[in-house]
């Protein structure tokens, strides 16, 4: 996805609530420049004004003014990582997932708008490749890896992404031959309600 298209998608997402609040204008597209040529794959809008973007070269951007300006709030030392999913709880708290084989799959969390980040998970299994994450609420979430030993691997957090544990895979159907997650935009694992998850 090009920078312009990601910015346009964000503008549309931010424009729809304006109509819902009675301003009376139909949804429209508005280009919001980010000031970078990074390829963005993750988007989390938490309000009309506040949103987060995550993409290549370990880049995380944040806006607090509806996309007029963007701040680079990337985790230090992450320039070789590919961020493909970001889940934000508000303007200060977010969790971002880097994809890749082995140690390239990582999770970071910020509690101060990206001023500082903590690495909360680094994959140590060379067979695992984490694709996406989702949250039920501000504490409970899951992350999904491509199959390991014939079944998708799932991580779980109970503290908002500050720590993660691999869940047992008993009861999970075997993956089909060649089946894997799609590591872009964070849509291969989606929470629905307080305990259900869709996996694709």
Residue ranges and their predicted role:
Residues 4-13:
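Bacterial N-terminal signal peptides
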Residues 21-200:
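Residue-level hotspots at or immediately adjacent to binding/recognition sites across diverse folds
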Residues 13-23:
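C-terminal region of N-terminal signal peptides and the immediate post-cleavage residues
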């Amino acid at each position: 996805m090009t920078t312009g298209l990601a910015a346009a998608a964000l503008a549309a997402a931010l424009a729809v609530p304006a109509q819902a609040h009675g301003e009376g204008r139909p949804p429209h597209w508005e280009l919001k420049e980010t000031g970078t040529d990074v390829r963005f794959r993750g988007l989390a809008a938490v309000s009309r004004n506040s949103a987060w973007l995550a993409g290549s070269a370990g880049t995380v951007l944040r806006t607090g003014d509806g996309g007029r300006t963007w701040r680079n709030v990337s985790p230090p030392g992450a320039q070789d990582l590919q961020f493909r999913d970001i889940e934000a709880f508000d303007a200060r708290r977010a969790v971002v997932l880097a994809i890749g084989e082995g140690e390239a799959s990582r999770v970071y969390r910020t509690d101060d708008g990206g001023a500082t980040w903590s690495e909360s998970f680094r994959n140590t299994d060379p067979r695992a490749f984490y694709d996406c994450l989702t949250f039920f609420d501000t504490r409970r979430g899951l992350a999904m890896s491509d199959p390991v030993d014939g079944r998708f691997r799932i991580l779980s957090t109970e503290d908002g992404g500050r720590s993660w544990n691999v869940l047992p895979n008993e009861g999970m159907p075997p993956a089909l031959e060649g089946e894997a997650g799609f590591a872009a935009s964070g849509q291969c694992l989606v929470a629905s309600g307080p305990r259900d998850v869709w996996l694709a």
